[in-house]
Each structure stands twice: as structure tokens, then as C-alpha cells.
Amino acid sequence: MPKFIEGNLDAKGLTFGIVVSRFNSFICERLLEGAIDALVRHGANETDITVARIPGAFEIPLAAKTMAASQKFDAVICLGAVIRGSTPHFEYVSSEVSKGVASVSLESGLPIAFGVLTTDTIEQAVERAGTKAGNKGFEAAVTAIETVNVIKAMK
């Protein structure tokens, strides 16, 4: 019978860095509220949560890399909102942010949770920031907690 390794959802004693974009702040602030809510509900102490506000989504990977390199955190949660406009800017930013965040996780060996919305409309972003479609910031924080614990169980 195989041995299964699963992470639990206990954030007690863990430290978290959160990188959040100021651009589209009316969305990103809801994502941040959701992430902090999830961490605290699962046992994290608010004093073990550090939030770095950055200008936009494109800057998320560098800020996440800097947080990961500081070795102060068990996981980093990335939050932002890229909403499609009438130019190709959406494709460039959303692609680079997702690749950059994945790269930081692989290079650092630290769980980096992706809570960056990439939506076609503002309405879709609002739905994913705490209304009809849940709160993706909350979900990213839960992912971070579980991933930290499963990685610890593997070692």
C-alpha cells in the first residue's frame, strides 16, 4: 500500500509574506483581506504576516523573490489583478507574472502561492475577490498553508 503525504491546514507558528499590487486596488484589497482572514482562521498570528505593497502586477515576481530570499517566511502569497483592456498589455503582463511567480517558487524552493487574477472584465475580478466566485486571496492563502505543511512532511 502506498504512503500518502498530505499537508494539513494548520498555520500556527508559520510566517507568511504577502506581496500585493496597488494597481486595481479596489480588487487587490479584497484579495488581501481574504488572504489575511484565511491565515488567521487557520491559526496564524497577525504578527507573523508581513505585507509588501508594490505598484503593479508586473513587479510581483521580483518582490516575491526578495521575500523568499530573506529567509524570514515559510511561504509567500502573491496577490494582484490584471484585467483585460483594449491593448495587448494584458497578455504581456499576465504571462510574465505567472511565469515569474512559478520561477521564484522553483528557484527558491519556497512555496509561492499564486493569487493573481487574470480576468476579461472588472465584473469577473469582483466576483473572484469575495462575491459570487469566492475570494481567490483566501484560496491562495489556504494553498500556501497546505503546501508549507506538505513540503515539511516530505523532508
Curated annotation (Swiss-Prot):
It catalyses: (2S)-2-hydroxy-3-oxobutyl phosphate + 5-amino-6-(D-ribitylamino)uracil = 6,7-dimethyl-8-(1-D-ribityl)lumazine + phosphate + 2 H2O + H(+). Keywords: Riboflavin biosynthesis, Transferase. The active site is at 89 (proton donor). Gene3D superfamilies: Lumazine/riboflavin synthase. It is an enzyme of class 2 (transferase). Pathway: Cofactor biosynthesis; riboflavin biosynthesis; riboflavin from 2-hydroxy-3-oxobutyl phosphate and 5-amino-6-(D-ribitylamino)uracil: step 1/2. Belongs to the DMRL synthase family. Catalyzes the formation of 6,7-dimethyl-8-ribityllumazine by condensation of 5-amino-6-(D-ribitylamino)uracil with 3,4-dihydroxy-2-butanone 4-phosphate. This is the penultimate step in the biosynthesis of riboflavin. This is 6,7-dimethyl-8-ribityllumazine synthase. It holds the Pfam family DMRL_synthase. Its EC number is 2.5.1.78. The gene is ribH. GO terms for molecular function: 6,7-dimethyl-8-ribityllumazine synthase activity. (2S)-2-hydroxy-3-oxobutyl phosphate binds at residues 86-87, 128. 5-amino-6-(D-ribitylamino)uracil binds at residues 23, 57-59, 81-83, 114. GO terms for biological process: riboflavin biosynthetic process. GO terms for cellular component: cytosol; riboflavin synthase complex.
